[in-house]
Amino acid sequence: MAAIGVHFGYTCACVAVFKDGRADVVANDAGDRVTPAVVAYRDTEQIVGIAAKQGRIRNAANTVVKVKQILGRRYDDPDAQAHKEESKCIVVNKSGLPRYEIDTGETTKYVSPEDVAKLIFHKMKETAQSALGSDVKDAVITVPFEFDEMQKNALRQAAESAGFNVLRLIHEPSAALLAYDIGQDSPLGKSHVLVYKLGGTSLSVTVLEVNSGVYRVLATQTDHQTGGESFTQELAQHLAAEFKKTFKQDVSGNARAMMKLMNSADVAKHTLSTLGSANCFVDSLYDGMDFECNVSRARFELICSSLFNKCIQPIKSLLEQVNLSTSDVNKVVLSGGSARIPKLQQMIRDLFPDVELLNSIPPDEVIPVGAAMQAGILVGKDSLALGEDSITVDCCASDITLKEVDDSGLEVFTVLFPSGTPLPARRQHTLQGPGSLSSVRLQLFQAQQPIAQIVLGDLEPKEELHDVVTVLTMKRDGSLHVTCTEQSSGRSEAITIETAAAAS
């Protein structure tokens, strides 16, 4: 049975299949290798992909886009609230959790983000099965570096509910390195690789250290305010200005007209990655008036000049953070659909004039290809080119902090796994309390979010101090096992948290 890799992005999804020693992205039923992560509800029907995206103008209130922004979030989470404000589909509060309000015509139903994601994963499963002519279950799923435990679990559960057996969650920079077999071509000595990802709604830059086939994340930076859609919006605003100049009508405040211009701008943006000019035509843009405008690549680059500069700045700040110069970087890997833009590639080349820029695999396909190769490793495909000594060293995406609370209510915070800690890792922490102590409550936080707690109660009073030893073991996949033991009595409690905070 073949193994597959699935990249579930903010705006698009893509699936790659590992078979006969190689990984390849496969096309969906529309012939496209990338599928819009868009789900539309119409009567009793659910539509996924390009048809849902194209029909959004007429069915915006029942069309869900960018569901990944809200996966694993509570309703009052700031990111969920930002998604609610942006979404044309109404987001409501149901028992503290976000739900999409869908009008089916006869009734109103409330759909969870996980159920929306399930439909997208199912589309990826169907795509892979159609290409292979057989059922597929085993899959490696990609996740952003900064995803927390709740987001990872939500993504995993959505994939499993779609029928996948999730072999592993792999972080996007690691998948990009695996796709290019980095670490095997020069297995001896230390090198540095920069992974640049410009997706639909976010920009991330990651620096990894490669040493004898072992990958270790040094640092990453993510900007959720900048992505490929930022370029589309700039171009759409330009088209609106051109329409106003020609027809003396301002459509910038008309949601329906601007959605049409966004669609046209998106097509033009993709065209300009391969051609020198693009023709934008919108039928009946406003008040029955058609609109046509030609945009050259040079004009597009001028319109988006400030955005291009904004996309380069994180590279400079990240290198400064890890005390590396551009000459210390040996390779740059491009990923994300908008990393195809020629101007952006040229600016990165100018920044790294003597560094190999890897873009032979289409940037929007490199991450699922790497995920499929990881899947091939995990199911034991002997024909895989990567050697068994090729290891991705996962690390904590954010701090794991322990909060202790004793009988008196005293709170003590200790960071046990700082962000960037290589995994697997083990930490031991000792708390000394008075003999009268009857219980200890420990809470675990990822960044500032509580993820679990453990209570050691019914401690016997004693004359000397209580020694309470807490041992935390975090595996490569981010699962965290915690044991809390009172030393003199041997009384102990233990918990396990799945996929707590790993990043690879």
From Swiss-Prot:
GO terms for molecular function: ATP binding; ATP hydrolysis activity; ATP-dependent protein folding chaperone; heat shock protein binding; protein folding chaperone. InterPro entries: ATPase_NBD (IPR043129), HSP70_peptide-bd_sf (IPR029047), Hsp_70_fam (IPR013126), HSPA14_NBD (IPR042049). Coiled coil: none annotated. Its main location: cytoplasm. It is found in: Cytoplasm, Cytosol. GO terms for cellular component: cytoplasm; cytosol; nucleus; plasma membrane. Keywords: ATP-binding, Chaperone, Cytoplasm, Nucleotide-binding. Pfam families: HSP70 (PF00012). GO terms for biological process: chaperone cofactor-dependent protein refolding; protein refolding. Component of the ribosome-associated complex (RAC), a complex involved in folding or maintaining nascent polypeptides in a folding-competent state. Component of ribosome-associated complex (RAC). Belongs to the heat shock protein 70 family. This is Heat shock 70 kDa protein 14. It comes from Danio rerio.
